[in-house]
Amino acid sequence: MVLSRDGDRTVLTMGSDFKGEPSEFALVVPVPTVLERDQIHVGDPKIVEHLDAYSAPRLVEYFDADPCMMAKYEAMTRNVAPAAGVLEDAVSRAKALGVTIEASYTVGEYDILILSAKQSNGLETWLNENHYRVPPGASRVLGSYLKQGMKFFVAKVNLKEQAKTGFKNLRPLQMAYESPKFMLPIRLGMVNADGPQELFVYALTRDGRVETTNYRTVKIPSDAEIPEYVKEVFADFYRDMFRTAVRKEDNTAVFLEYAWDMGWCDPCASEPLSRDELRELGVFWLDESQPGANRRISGAGTMPFVTRLHLRYDAAHFPEDLVFQQTADRSNFQGRYILRHPWTGADDCSAAQEYRKSLRGRREKQATTLAALTGWNLEDIRTRMHVRGDWSTETDSVKWYQKLWKK
């Protein structure tokens, strides 16, 4: 369900995961007023899918740097500032320019980095060296953001083309109406329900995030560091994590999975929706006179705030319809899960030895975190991680022949 609301005006978009024959489909939804023909519309399912992808829980990936190189670099900086090109490693080069690569990951069709920087000219140099085209003289603008303590989201397009799909499911129905009641009727759908039902609510509002007033709104567990193999079973991980979270809240909570200004994202699971897409979803307050109407939204004042809510409900635990309120809270939140890839080089400096020892504790913490989040058996997790009894792996020690011919 997508709810676009400002004041008393609401546009409700109802998607469906109906799998049967179209002739068997029936939908009954209470509405606050008699709807005229012009208040009813058939929407584009791809736009709802886009909104779902944009706000979906996401994996982010970090890659550990060579501890020997980092130790060498730190020692050098204590004595003399390195000239450009002293270190070929990308991380070290960035540091030489006062730029820190805070995160590196691939999400969807984008290769993404999150950067922080000390000086705008160093950041501008790094961006140009790495083929992120910035206009000449961008240093001043970059500097204004740095003074605000902001980070920089940079992306390159992954050119692999997504498969094109047709309408495999029923298209969503939309209705536009005015009512002081900001609510979503769910009770009728539970009458003949076979077990608990799953519901996603995407709220698009002008001022801030949306929450339920008659049920607790709880943030989904987030920012957890989990084992690398979860990347291959992320759907299973999230399914079981959500189930565990629902049980911990006694099956009575509505979970916040995403809250963000539509004008940007960090990281982006998918690009923000275009102005045309948002208007199709009922964001009627967009300034249509603003130039570049088909571009992604930029500027302040009209950008909708996106709230993604997720609940598993039945009549026993959700006896009332969902009642919402819009708040002035524009703080960002997302379901975000971290994969940290260890460095696997053969260098055997003292920093590397200490680094390898530290991996054991890190793996143990990742495994216990995963078990707590999902209810998965810890021994099964250990098996999937390919660790020994002390949480070490084969890559934690340098083989004798790797020491013979160091590069």
Predicted regions: what is each one?
Residues 2-67, 123-144, 149:
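Surface-exposed, glycine/proline- and aromatic-rich loop segments on solvent-exposed faces
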Residues 7-9, 22-24, 100, 196, ...:
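Extracytoplasmic
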Residues 9-11, 22, 107-111, 150, ...:
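Coil-to-beta-strand transition motifs
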Residues 1, 134-369, 373, 377-383, ...:
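Accessory, solvent-exposed terminal regions and/or long lumenal/extracellular loops of proteins
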Residues 35, 41-107, 290-292, 298:
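A cross-kingdom signal targeting lumenal/periplasmic-facing segments of multi-pass membrane
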Residues 74, 78-163:
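Long alpha-helical, hydrophobic tracts
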Residues 16-18, 31, 116-119, 159, ...:
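A mature extracytoplasmic/lumenal domain signature
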